[in-house]
Amino acid sequence: MLLLRSALTRALASRTLAPQVCSSFATGPRQYDGIFYEFRSYYLKPSKMNEFLENFKKNAHLRTAHSELVGYWSVEFGGRMNTVFHIWKYDNFAHRTEVRKALAKDKEWQEQFLIPNLALIDKQESEITYLVPWCKLEKPPKEGVYELATFQMKPGGPALWGDAFKRAVHAHVNLGYTKLVGVFHTEYGALNRVHVLWWNESADSRAAGRHKSHEDPRVVAAVRESVNYLVSQQNMLLIPTSFSPLK
């Protein structure tokens, strides 16, 4: 009886020990660092796209005096037309709050750009994202085009799908046909969403590289593993504006 009770106790104890799951996406470095990136999408009235961009170009210095602009693009393929997409960097949430308060008090910004241009915008969207710990923001070597690939992953978080996703990204990087700019994990917005920002010399070089990658067994194997955790995905071709820091 004692032996049976002892064996049962050990069995129950082993079942209560939760397995430790580690992931290279896991929360930690990105939260400790505090730095995050705000993704903003402005859907503009079709007849007002050029006017809006010209107005921002003339007044961009008023906005960038308050916080860092990472990049500013127009959507060419894969998304709603007449859309501009931009990324802003903040040290932490307190920093963003300070910036928003300062902008609200900046009469020059309000009067020269914001108020006159609000009527040109149909809709605005915002997401807060962190760079994943294994990726730092990279600047491309020259001007080109950008691809924003967005992946909606299954619930469970990076501990479930992070490592497989990392291997899939690196499989493409290792082929050398494209340059990885950054991998971002959404904190506010749709959860379990990952954005991968790529740079290519042109849309045609990107197409040729993708064709090559689809025939590479290393890429095929890594992607096949990652899609087990995928719900949906979308990609957009982005054209940098003349005033975008990332060209």
UniProtKB/Swiss-Prot annotation:
It comes from the Eukaryota. It comes from Pongo abelii (Sumatran orangutan). Pfam families: NIPSNAP. Belongs to the NipSnap family. GO terms for cellular component: cytosol; mitochondrion. Keywords: Acetylation, Cytoplasm. It is found in: Cytoplasm, Cytosol. Its main location: cytoplasm. The keyword Magnesium does not apply. The modification N6-acetyllysine is found at K48, K166. This is Protein NipSnap homolog 3A. GO terms for biological process: mitophagy. InterPro entries: Dimeric_a/b-barrel, NIPSNAP, NipSnap_domain.
